A protein has these predicted regions:
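Short, acidic, metal-binding catalytic loop of nucleotide-sugar glycosyltransferases
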Residues: 33-43
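N-proximal low-complexity "stem/linker" segments adjacent to membrane-targeting elements
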Residues: 1-34
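Short, flexible, basic/aromatic active-site loop/helix in glycosyltransferases
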Residues: 123-129, 137-159, 163
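Glycine-rich, basic loop-to-helix element that forms the pyrophosphate-binding segment
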Residues: 71-87
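A conserved acidic beta->alpha catalytic loop
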Residues: 34, 50-58, 99
């Protein structure tokens, strides 16, 4: 709480670290704890966006003293855009509340963003082992997934971007804004829009590797089924990974108006 209060006093932060929260009362504290423990030798601000939560998320925000804003239009695009509108930093670091960040995460991203010609940065993520997901199974899954992402990033880095590990130049991000008409992919869409204006830097370092929840990984049931589903999808699109693409057609089931 003291660290959050001190951070709120930074009137000219170099980086804005922005969480989006929808019903995250049980995860908010651990996420903020990891962010407050980050080692930074430059001023930052930590902002949170309460995205139409129906649990005690807002009450926890008030109790912790984090600077936050309410966004009543539900969806990650709306929440991230709200945070972008409020950010004061030259660089913008996107944060998911169900994720834990290593102590040099912010510094590692900002160091790359400060290099000439860099538009955005993105990094890798791991999952926390539990009763449904063994450490060994996750190791193999992540190793093969990381290999796929490294190959894919050569020509189509925008497809490797995830909002929980995404940073960018704030001014450039505001030029395009986050898409609010899609259910997922607002982060990669913004990265694609920024692609002609600078490099999309893939950070492989463990200093920027986060620990996150399972999200869509659980939609396919077991870890094996998740791996099989993604492997089939990867093989189907293997040829296209080696060609650049500047535009993607929206899938009907990903459009909010059809939801």
């Amino acid at each position: 709480k003291k660290k959050l209060r001190k951070l709120s006093e930074n009137k000219q932060p170099l980086a804005s670290v922005v969480l989006i929260c929808h019903n995250e009362e049980t995860r908010l504290l651990s996420c903020l704890w990891s962010l407050c423990d980050n080692e930074c030798d430059f001023p930052i601000e930590i902002l949170a966006v309460n995205n139409n939560s129906t649990d005690r998320t807002e009450a926890v925000m008030q109790q912790l003293g984090v600077t936050y804003f309410n966004e009543t239009k539900e969806g990650p695009g709306h929440a991230r855009q709200c945070g972008l509108n409020q950010a004061k930093g030259k660089y913008h670091i996107c944060i998911d509340t169900d994720t834990i960040y290593p102590s040099r995460y912010i510094k590692t991203h900002v160091k790359q963003l400060m290099k000439p010609g860099v538009a955005c940065t993105f990094s890798l993520w791991s999952f926390i082992p539990d009763e449904r997901h063994s450490a060994t199974g996750l190791w193999w899954y992540e190793a093969l997934r990381d290999l796929h992402l490294r190959i894919q990033s050569i020509q189509r880095p925008e497809l490797c971007v995830r909002g929980m590990t995404f940073g960018f130049n704030t001014e450039l991000g505001r030029k395009f804004g986050f898409r609010t008409d899609i259910i997922r992919g607002e982060d990669g869409s913004l990265a694609l829009a920024m692609k002609p204006y600078g490099k999309l830097v893939f950070i492989h370092s463990g200093k920027a590797r986060v620990m996150t929840g399972y999200g869509t990984l659980n939609n396919d049931g077991s870890l094996f089924n998740s791996f099989k589903t993604r492997l089939v999808k990867a093989f189907k699109g293997a040829g296209s990974m080696f060609t650049r693409k500047n535009e993607y057609k929206d899938e009907d089931n990903n459009l909010i108006k059809n939801k």
